[in-house]
């Protein structure tokens, strides 16, 4: 029984304290689902007009205007992080107990006790000191640049667009996945039907890889078990 517990307990601790890889939900924000879609105004044009509502009118804005229209997002994200922490603690304790601690009130007793103290004048002193100094620093610079075509999923009642798009590439056995969603204003879309990612509200950008490189960078399960139960 003891041998069984010896082998099972580490895995039990690992199951309680195992870490999960960070995840991101591409689900639309709550307000996007709650807001009613904008009602489209179907205005009929006069027959023979140059501004008709055909599939390719002569005079029209090339920017996305309706549901299922495409918008190209230029992703230019960069993050810079620098943190530093210092901690120092110190504690010192001193205790003294002198010899000759016996005393008396009357003269005879006091005289006798003085003689005893002279022979038993034993005292002690203790000193303890604890010091701790810790320093930590971290710096990180990351950048991610790419473009992705998204689709207008919903036009909100205030005229803003909820967009969503994804792209998957398979190169030499490595699969790259890019997903993006968020809310944009139609006024921020350029004349070439592109928009910078900095103008996307509630932006969610996911980039991950699947393949040999991704598997080689993951920690083996044995290392995770040791880290989970290692107390120091």
UniProtKB/Swiss-Prot annotation:
GO biological process: bacterial-type flagellum-dependent cell motility
Tagged with keyword Mitochondrion: no
Pfam families: FlgH
Lipid-bearing positions (S-diacylglycerol cysteine): 16
Membrane topology label: Lipid-anchor
Chief location bin: membrane
Lipidation (N-palmitoyl cysteine): 16
Gene Ontology terms for molecular function: cytoskeletal motor activity
NCBIfam families: PRK00249.1-3
Subunit (UniProt): The basal body constitutes a major portion of the flagellar organelle and consists of four rings (L,P,S, and M) mounted on a central rod.
Annotated HAMAP family: FlgH
Entry function: Assembles around the rod to form the L-ring and probably protects the motor/basal body from shearing forces during rotation.
The name this protein goes by in its record: Flagellar L-ring protein
């Amino acid at each position: 029984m003891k041998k069984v517990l010896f082998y099972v307990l580490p895995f039990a601790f690992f199951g309680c304290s195992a870490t999960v890889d960070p995840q991101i939900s591409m689900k639309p924000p709550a307000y996007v689902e709650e807001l009613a879609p904008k009602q489209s105004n179907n205005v009929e044009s006069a027959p023979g007009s140059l501004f008709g509502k055909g599939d390719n009118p002569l005079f029209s804005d090339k920017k996305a205007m309706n549901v299922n229209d495409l918008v190209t997002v230029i992703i230019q994200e960069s993050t810079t992080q620098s943190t530093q922490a210092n901690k120092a603690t110190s504690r010192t304790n001193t205790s003294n107990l002198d010899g000759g601690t016996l005393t008396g009130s009357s003269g005879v007793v006091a005289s006798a006790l003085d003689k005893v103290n002279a022979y038993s004048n034993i005292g002690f002193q203790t000193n303890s000191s604890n010091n701790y100094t810790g320093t930590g620093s971290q710096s990180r610079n990351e950048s991610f640049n790419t473009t992705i075509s998204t689709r207008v999923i919903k036009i909100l009642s205030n005229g803003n667009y909820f967009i969503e798009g994804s792209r998957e590439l398979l190169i030499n056995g490595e699969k790259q996945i890019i997903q993006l969603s968020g809310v944009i204003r139609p006024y921020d879309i350029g004349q070439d039907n592109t928009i910078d990612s900095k103008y996307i509200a509630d932006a969610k950008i996911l980039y991950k890889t699947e393949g040999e490189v991704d598997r080689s960078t993951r920690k083996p399960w044995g290392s995770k078990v040791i880290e989970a139960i290692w107390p120091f």
